[in-house]
Amino acid sequence: GHSKSDKRVYRSVEEEKKWKEKDPLTAYERKLYMDRNTIRELRSKVREFVDTEFNRAFEKKDEVLTLEETKEYVYGTAPDIKVHKSGMHPSTYRLAIREALSEILRDEKATLIGEDVGKYGGCFGVTGPLYNEFSENILETPVSEEAFTGVAVGEGIMGERVIEEIMYGDFLTLASDGLVNHAAKIRYMSAGQLSCPMVIRAPIGSGTGHGSQHTQSLEGMFLNIPGLKIVAPSDPFTAKALLKSAYE
């Protein structure tokens, strides 16, 4: 079992011992081009680092956060972003969002990730020709919202800037573990040491004729999750401004 209170119903002590002998770390050491002394020294440094961090964490385990500190660790500080209305022109939601993505993807750290967002141009044609210009910044994925949301969360924690597209808002239910239990909580659980600045874009609601599993408005499910921010643009200008603001 996986619990610390495991009663060894599934495995005996003897079986556990046999598996410990197959420890992948030990097995991998045999393949390294290092002598035994170098490996021991490396192990010692890693163990010292882990012990130091472990003890440091336990020294703080009884500290009680104030309400202000709690808020600080749930949400990062948002920059003051000025939006200029110069150069206005007629547009649609599709074109406005594409403009925003085109400007965002000029950032070398930006990655657009999702199903059919590349050569296909997006399920609703939003990404369109962007793949021709930003193929290195666009990652097309298999049809598994849970999997590629996990990739996006991991990238965000590692410092990359991810814009994830969920084909239909209904499929946020499949991505909810990564969003609710990891992306939304990592800053708080690490006391501000880690963060996950990612953006998810998903079409919500009916009107596409694709049935009950593709036309729901599920944003209310996520409204009460600390660490998540939800925006719903009411016009093309706001759609572009909010997407860029969310990224920045």
What do these predicted regions represent?
Residues 1-83:
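Glycine/aspartate-rich loop-and-adjacent alpha/beta segment that forms the canonical ThDP
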